[in-house]
Amino acid sequence: MASRARKKRPSGRPKERALTEERIVAAALQLIDSSELASFSLRDVARSLHVYPTAIYWYVKSRDELLGKVVAYATRDVIPPSSNTDWKVWLRDMCHRYRRAVQKHPNIAPLIGSQMRSNAGIRADFIDGVLTALAAAGFPDERIVDAYNVIIGALVGFICQELAALPAENQAKWAEAHRKRVSMLDVIQHQALARHLPRMANKAFIVRWSNGTEVPLDTSFDLFIDVIILGLEQSLKARR
């Protein structure tokens, strides 16, 4: 009896066990969490998943595309669960959710804050949520884009500055050197600085030697949201 001929494996998408886009993106995010963004590569992702690099390209076409998907994945839970609420409550909740998402993965902060490639992970639901909140606030169509840019620019700017990366090498040495620089600032000629520097040291932008992963700026972020919301309200009142 003739032996059965082996079936040829069909061409097309690779059959690696349970390989999906979500697994690839999650693995990429895990690698970015544990190393520097600059050294991240698709080969590293393939190695961590025990597949050939060519298998990755069935799901993402390039490193840039994958990085965009990583941002979308890391920020997937930033939209508040209910849209049927006051726009100020929604906006405040969204800002806190966005910050917590980036705090969990601080190595994506420079990707979000300074690289256009992060836009490849565009989330229509996130943009729609912000626009819906602004429309509920009363912003007319001709001003809603400016208000949207204020929110996104300010939010991303604060978070990425708060979580700014320390020097890649000799972090402890750099931190000690900057602490000394701060302590040696000329407070004699700058009275406001002399008064507030003890409170600001390592707790305020420019005069800190730890970033937000070690010394989070919680109360400053709360005030930041208050200012943004009040500013939006005042902007509406001024045009009426």
Task: Describe the function of each predicted region.
Residues R23, A27, L31-E65, K69:
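Helix-turn-helix
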Residues I79-D125, D141-I144, Y148-I151:
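Hydrophobic alpha-helical connector segments
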Residues F126-V182, L232-R240:
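Hydrophobic alpha-helical bundle segments that form small-molecule/ligand-binding pockets
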Residues T213-R240:
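A hydrophobic membrane-anchoring alpha-helix module
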